[in-house]
């Protein structure tokens, strides 16, 4: 079954509500480049209230800093393309099994996708540019070769069934379920959960 990650959570009330639903991962962005940014201390606070796996998301981070970041979260997502030296360094750490690497959904990044898969267990194929929908054709092609990828990028209630039919490892959803950046629409999240976990056309 496809797993579900709700990302960009910035309020404790949302996180507590989602922890009661059939959501597999809760993403929290601790990088100031995002309008959904929260301080790292928020992660420690959240862990007191929920047992669901927490994903700490950053764009700007040094590989040497990740081990410390993982002290307050279950997984760490690096949402940028790494250079070869960073990938090699990441391979040397035991905690790389708790790392999620971002790969832009473009055929130009096919080689990088292969290197990312060789480095970590969890890889997210997402939009090339912020605010742009993920390229369905690229995702479909990548998943034929690597069926254990996660997929994100403007996935909404209107198009989610198309992505479920591709049977990715997980779907990463954020902006399409927001009232405003960082604040989610609980009813919309419930609809997403219903489709992914119980009501998708591909599972009927």
UniProtKB/Swiss-Prot annotation:
Pfam families: PRAI (PF00697). It catalyses: N-(5-phospho-beta-D-ribosyl)anthranilate = 1-(2-carboxyphenylamino)-1-deoxy-D-ribulose 5-phosphate. Its EC number is 5.3.1.24. One of its GO terms (molecular function) is phosphoribosylanthranilate isomerase activity. GO terms for biological process: L-tryptophan biosynthetic process. Keywords: Amino-acid biosynthesis, Aromatic amino acid biosynthesis, Isomerase, Tryptophan biosynthesis. The keyword Amino-acid biosynthesis applies. InterPro entries: Aldolase_TIM, PRAI_dom, RibuloseP-bd_barrel, TrpF_fam. Pathway: Amino-acid biosynthesis; L-tryptophan biosynthesis; L-tryptophan from chorismate: step 3/5. PANTHER family: N-(5'-PHOSPHORIBOSYL)ANTHRANILATE ISOMERASE. Belongs to the TrpF family. This is N-(5'-phosphoribosyl)anthranilate isomerase. It comes from Saccharolobus solfataricus (strain ATCC 35092 / DSM 1617 / JCM 11322 / P2) (Sulfolobus solfataricus).
């Amino acid at each position: 079954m496809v797993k579900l990650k709700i990302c960009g959570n910035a309020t404790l009330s949302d996180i507590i509500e989602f922890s009661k639903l059939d959501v597999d991962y809760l993403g929290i962005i601790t990088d100031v480049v995002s309008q959904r940014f929260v301080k790292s201390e928020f992660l420690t606070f959240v862990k007191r209230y929920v047992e669901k796996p927490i994903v700490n998301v950053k764009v700007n981070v040094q590989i040497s800093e990740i081990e410390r970041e993982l002290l307050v979260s279950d997984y760490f997502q690096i949402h940028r393309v790494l250079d070869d030296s960073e990938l090699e360094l990441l391979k040397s750490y035991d905690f790389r099994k708790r790392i999620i690497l971002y790969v832009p959904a473009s055929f130009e990044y096919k080689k990088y996708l292969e290197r990312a898969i060789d480095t970590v267990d969890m890889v997210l194929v997402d939009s090339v540019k912020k605010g742009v929908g993920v390229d369905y054709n690229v995702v479909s092609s990548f998943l034929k070769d690597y069926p254990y990828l996660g997929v994100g990028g403007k996935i909404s209630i209107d198009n989610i069934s198309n992505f479920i039919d591709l049977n990715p490892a997980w779907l990463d959803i954020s902006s399409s379920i927001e009232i405003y950046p960082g604040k989610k629409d609980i009813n919309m999240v419930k609809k997403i959960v219903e489709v992914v976990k119980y009501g998708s056309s591909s599972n009927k």
